[in-house]
Design a protein with these regions (language model features):
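Short amphipathic alpha-helical segments with heptad-repeat character
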Residues: 44-47, 51-54, 58, 84, ...
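Helix-loop segments that flank and shape redox-cofactor active sites
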Residues: 42, 59-85, 147, 151-162
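Intrinsically disordered regulatory regions flanking bHLH/HLH domains
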Residues: 30-51, 99-109, 113-130
C-alpha cells in the first residue's frame, strides 16, 4: 500500500528573496498521436528513427571499443589509435544526435534496455581475427552512412534543418572511417 511521504511546510526565511516561479517553462503537452509538421511529415516517426540511429551509434561505440581492446596484428599501434578515435567519435555522435532529439522536446530512452529496444539489426563480431573484426566494423560503418543518408532525407521533409545538416556531416564521417578501414584491410 502506498503511504504518502509526510509534507513539511517550509516557512519563508526573513530577508531571503524567494525564487521566481515560472522562469523555466513547462514542457509542452504532447498529443496522443505523433505530431505532424507543416509539411505533413510525421515528426513522431522521424524522432523514432533518430532514436534508432542513436542506438546504432551507441552499439558502434561499444563495438569499436571492444575491437580496440582485442585487436592484434603487425599494425596494432595504428589500428589501436584509430579505433580509440572512433569510439570517442561515436560517443560524440550519439550525444549530438540525442541533444537534437531533446531540442525537439522529445525524450530519449532512460537506460540501455530502452536503447536496445530501439536498435536496428547490426552485424556482430564473431571472430578474434583482426581482419574479421575490422571487416564487420567496416560493414557497420557503411550501414551507418546509409542510415544517416535516409534520415537526412526525412529531416528535410519535417523541416528539421539542424538534424538534416548533421546527418550530412555524419554520412561523411562514416564513409571516411569505412574507407580508412578498407585501405587497412587491403594491406593485411
Amino acid at each position: 500500500m502506498y503511504t504518502q511521504y509526510p509534507r513539511i511546510e517550509a516557512t519563508p526565511l526573513q530577508g531571503v528573496p524567494s525564487p521566481q516561479s515560472g522562469v523555466v517553462p513547462e514542457p509542452q503537452a504532447k498529443p496522443k498521436g505523433p505530431a505532424k509538421s507543416k509539411a505533413n511529415g510525421d515528426v513522431g516517426a522521424f524522432i523514432q528513427q533518430c532514436i534508432s540511429l542513436c542506438s546504432y551509434l551507441k552499439e558502434l561505440e561499444t563495438q569499436s571499443h571492444l575491437i580496440h581492446l582485442n585487436y592484434e596484428g603487425s599494425n596494432f599501434l595504428g589500428v589501436h589509435a584509430f579505433l580509440k578515435e572512433q569510439y570517442e567519435a561515436h560517443l560524440e555522435q550519439f550525444d549530438t544526435l540525442a541533444e537534437f532529439i531533446r531540442s525537439m522536446d522529445y525524450m530519449m530512452p532512460m537506460c540501455g534496455c530502452g536503447l536496445k529496444d530501439a536498435a536496428p539489426v547490426m552485424n556482430a563480431v564473431t571472430s578474434y581475427k583482426g581482419a574479421d573484426m575490422l571487416g564487420v566494423y567496416y560493414k557497420n560503418l557503411e550501414e551507418l552512412g546509409m542510415k544517416a543518408k535516409k534520415l537526412e532525407a526525412l529531416a528535410e521533409k519535417v523541416h528539421a534543418i539542424d538534424i538534416q545538416n548533421y546527418m550530412a556531416d555524419l554520412v561523411g564521417q562514416a564513409f571516411k572511417a569505412a574507407w580508412m578501414i578498407k585501405a587497412t584491410l587491403r594491406n593485411s
